[in-house]
Structures are given as structure tokens and as C-alpha cells.
A protein has these predicted regions:
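Auxiliary, metal-adjacent structural segments of Zn-dependent hydrolase domains
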Residues: 1-27, 34-38
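Active-site recognition of the HExxH zinc-binding catalytic motif
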Residues: 42-54
Length: 54
């Protein structure tokens, strides 16, 4: 089961991506055709870092 978190604005960028964090802690990116895979992964890692801080 995947959980959609939210549309993520990239730092200093206007291209959004949709991230889902899976139950096993991995993540899935959706709607990333307009950005490079590396940037999408970075955006999700930033989101995951924020979530796990709390």
C-alpha cells in the first residue's frame, strides 16, 4: 500500500512532483517527467528527513 504525501515544490524550483512513502520506508515518485530523476529523489529525501525529525 502506498500513501500519497503531497505535491512537493522543489527548493528554488517550480516543478512539482508527487511522492508516496511506502510502508517499508521506501518511496515512489509520480509526475516526475518534467524533472530529472536525481532531483526528484533529492526532493523526496528532504521530505522524508522532515517527516522523520518529528
Amino acid at each position: 500500500m502506498e500513501y500519497i504525501i503531497e505535491r512537493i515544490p522543489f527548493p528554488y524550483d517550480t516543478i512539482p512532483a508527487v511522492a508516496a512513502i511506502n510502508k517499508d520506508g521506501s518511496y515512489t515518485i509520480y509526475e516526475n517527467a518534467l524533472c530529472s530523476e536525481a532531483r526528484c529523489e533529492r526532493a523526496v529525501r528532504l521530505l522524508v528527513d522532515e517527516i522523520t525529525k518529528e
